[in-house]
UniProtKB/Swiss-Prot annotation:
Source species: Xenopus laevis
SUPFAM superfamilies reported in the protein's UniProt record: F-box domain
UniProt-recorded name of the protein: F-box only protein 5-A
PROSITE patterns: ZF_ZBR
Pfam family, one: F-box
Quaternary structure and partners: Part of a SCF (SKP1-cullin-F-box) protein ligase complex. Interacts with btrc. Interacts with skp1. Interacts with cdc20. Interacts with pin1; stabilizes fbxo5 by preventing its association with btrc in an isomerization-dependent pathway; this interaction is present during G2 phase and prevents fbxo5 degradation. Interacts with plk1.
Effect on the protein of changing residue 364 to S: Does not inhibit APC
Pathway: Protein modification; protein ubiquitination
Amino acid sequence: MMCGFASNQSPKKLSSKKSSATNVHLEISPVKHHPPCKVYENVQGSCLDSAICTTVAKCADLTDDLPVHNKENLLHRLNDLETNSYEEYSALQDSGYSSILQNDSPCQDETDRKVSDIQVRETPKNFMSYQRPFHTLSKINLPILRFEEAVCSTLKKMRKTNKKIDWNAVDVVCGGNYGLEHLIGKSMGLERFDILAELFHRDFKHLLTKILRHLSAMDLINVISVSTTWRKLLQKDNWAYNAYKLGCKELCEKRAKVSSHTATRDESLCRVPLASVQKVAASSLCTSKKQSKNKNGGLSCNRLAEFIEVAQTLKNDQSLKVCVDCGSPAKHDPCLHRAICTRESCKLDFCTRCSCKYHFSKSCLMSKPGSYRIPSEPLPGSKKSKQNLRRL
């Protein structure tokens, strides 16, 4: 076997040019190459001797293990490599799995399986049992799907026993609590829809307060007269109910001021010839004072408004009286001493002298003597007669 170095060759025969070349490769970008010192050459020579001796010994050890480099040994080794690669490839083909990548191997497949098993084992059981599919969640959340499922299940059960469909069973299912009253769009297509009542039934107080804040006093008066539900929702809102009360008071005061110019004196028997000349009507203020004297309390604002409305429809020879039964305004004819109540549910026709049913030409049946007193004529020169003259 040929070797790179001979054992008899001395290291001193190496040229200085080669040593300087090796030193140049080790240095880092020198700017100027100075000539080496003599001491440095001696040290470098000793280092090279030791390095060459070690490399020669290592090469000798390696050459003992390696086979002889001839043609027969080389062909034998190539044949062994081809047989090994063919056996591995045939094993992969027989197993039914062959990958293009060279790094894939059955050992790697086993490690992948172990890792997947470890990952499955590490997942907690509570989490795996808690997970549900998406369609079950949607069925639970949507009331229409729950109702549909209940109807289909009942129809299936009935189909097994009877071929005919009994729609009464569907009505029974509809009576269940599925929350269908809260569905969006269930009131679509209706001509009229009470939004305030729906908000009140669903207890949306914050929305009702915002709506009522935008209404005036007259609007609140109209709201309270629509229905009982609107009255309740207005009474529950303190601010709106107080505004409604103030609006009612202001309205009554305005109507009283407007009707003050129509105030006239009370009718009397001796004033019959003048009935066709002047309009005789009872003053709203006078009637309220009389009612307060006769009864504890006075007429309410609504009752006062009724009297004012009826007074505007009176004829020249008519006046107002209070109904004996219901206290509503009654149109009085002083010539006949007859009064008829204007209330539709009452419509009492009574005599103003005896407060009984009107008896036409018959004499009055006095239940209590002295209960009815014919008003005397005013004395000439008295205060009342002077007022009558001024009015004429």
